[in-house]
């Protein structure tokens, strides 16, 4: 059996352009592609934080260091310049590989420069008190340190 696993996430990127008449895809700064280990042509899911739109397309490389996140083609009707998006890639893995796999998670600033990275898909944006972990209920007080989700999974796997 193959499992579909998160391989990369670029969190809270700012859309810099949208071109309805372009053939399709999402243009991503080549430096971000490399840091996230994404290839041109690789399938990605884009989640628009502003309006909830969710779409699938493929990545193409934009100029390195430009900060470009460009939504191309029909998706430009769903995502506008200035919107915050999460760009997600998934990969198929056999069970053993999936249990060892560590995703790449990038955090970017408003200019789409990398400000942090990690391997915990539930980690909130560093230094942003309005971002919450995705794996802790918000109505239950937590007064003990919570290990990252990735570390907890690896720890659980090591004891099996």
From Swiss-Prot:
Residue positions of the active site: 25, 58
Binding site for substrate: 57, 73-75
Residue(s) carrying Pyruvic acid (Ser): 25
Catalytic activity annotation: L-aspartate + H(+) = beta-alanine + CO2
Cofactor binding, per record: Binds 1 pyruvoyl group covalently per subunit.
Subunit note: Heterooctamer of four alpha and four beta subunits.
Xref: InterPro entries: Asp_de-COase-like_dom_sf, Asp_decarbox
Gene: panD2
EC number(s) on file: 4.1.1.11
Cross-referenced Gene3D superfamilies: 2.40.40.20
Entry's Gene Ontology molecular function annotations: aspartate 1-decarboxylase activity
Cofactor(s) for this UniProt protein: pyruvate
The name this protein goes by in its record: Aspartate 1-decarboxylase 2
Pathway: Cofactor biosynthesis; (R)-pantothenate biosynthesis; beta-alanine from L-aspartate: step 1/1
Keyword Cytoplasm: yes
Keywords: Autocatalytic cleavage, Cytoplasm, Decarboxylase, Lyase, Pantothenate biosynthesis, Pyruvate, Schiff base, Zymogen
GO cellular component: cytosol
SUPFAM superfamilies cross-referenced by the UniProt entry: ADC-like (SSF50692)
Keyword Secreted: no
GO biological process: alanine biosynthetic process; pantothenate biosynthetic process
Family that this chain belongs to: Belongs to the PanD family.
Location of this chain's protein in the cell: Cytoplasm
Main location, first listed in the record: cytoplasm
PTM: Is synthesized initially as an inactive proenzyme, which is activated by self-cleavage at a specific serine bond to produce a beta-subunit with a hydroxyl group at its C-terminus and an alpha-subunit with a pyruvoyl group at its N-terminus.
Function: Catalyzes the pyruvoyl-dependent decarboxylation of aspartate to produce beta-alanine.
């Amino acid at each position: 059996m193959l499992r579909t696993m998160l391989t990369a996430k670029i969190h809270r990127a700012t859309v810099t352009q949208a071109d309805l008449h372009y053939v399709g895809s999402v243009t991503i700064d080549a430096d971000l592609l490399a840091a996230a280990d994404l290839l041109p042509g690789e399938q990605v899911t884009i989640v628009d934080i502003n309006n909830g739109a969710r779409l699938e397309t493929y990545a193409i490389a934009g100029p390195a260091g430009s900060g470009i996140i460009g939504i191309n083609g029909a998706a430009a009707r769903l995502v506008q310049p200035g919107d915050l998006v999460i760009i997600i890639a998934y990969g198929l893995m056999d069970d053993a590989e999936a249990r060892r796999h560590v995703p790449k998670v990038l955090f970017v600033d408003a200019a789409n420069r990398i400000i942090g990275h990690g391997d915990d898909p539930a980690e909130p944006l560093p230094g942003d008190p309005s971002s919450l972990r995705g794996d802790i209920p918000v109505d239950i007080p937590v007064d003990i340190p919570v290990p990252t989700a990735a570390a907890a999974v690896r720890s659980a796997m090591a004891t099996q």
